[in-house]
């Protein structure tokens, strides 16, 4: 991928995550982290409403099917590893209920939110 294309993809991802964050705020969630990065992985968005914590992967694609297949098992493991690190930093860790969700950003559509996109395998 050329530098120009990489930059374009990066900014497209930023815009998509902003749309997804807006969508979650409309549903009553508070965004507590964006692009949480660790050595083992990255989480696009972390949202919270009460004791429910959403670990959200965001993908912008032409179709929902394309967006869903863009997340493979290896991506899930990296997201889980990053989630473990973030959760360990929380004081109320034992009281939190964690859910792994997915938001697809599709052209000319509202964000498509899939709850429980995958389950933790640990």
Swiss-Prot record:
InterPro entries: Restrct_endonuc-II-like (IPR011335), tRNA_endonuc-like_dom_sf (IPR011856), UPF0102_YraN-like (IPR003509). Coiled coil: none annotated. One of its GO terms (molecular function) is nucleic acid binding. Belongs to the UPF0102 family. HAMAP family: UPF0102. This is UPF0102 protein BARBAKC583_1042. It comes from Bartonella bacilliformis (strain ATCC 35685 / KC583 / Herrer 020/F12,63). The lineage of its organism: Bacteria, Pseudomonadati, Pseudomonadota, Alphaproteobacteria, Hyphomicrobiales.
């Amino acid at each position: 991928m050329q530098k120009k294309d990489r930059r374009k993809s990066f900014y497209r991802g930023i815009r998509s995550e902003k749309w997804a964050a807006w969508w979650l705020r409309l549903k009553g969630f508070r965004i507590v982290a964006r692009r949480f990065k660790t050595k083992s992985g990255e989480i696009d968005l972390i949202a919270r409403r009460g004791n429910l914590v959403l670990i959200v992967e965001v993908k912008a694609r032409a179709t929902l099917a394309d967006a869903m297949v863009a997340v493979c098992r290896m991506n899930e493991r990296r997201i889980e590893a990053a989630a473990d690190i973030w959760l360990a930093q929380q004081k109320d860790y034992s009281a939190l209920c964690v859910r792994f969700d997915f938001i697809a950003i599709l052209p000319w559509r509202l964000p498509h939110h899939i709850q429980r996109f995958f389950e933790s395998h640990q």
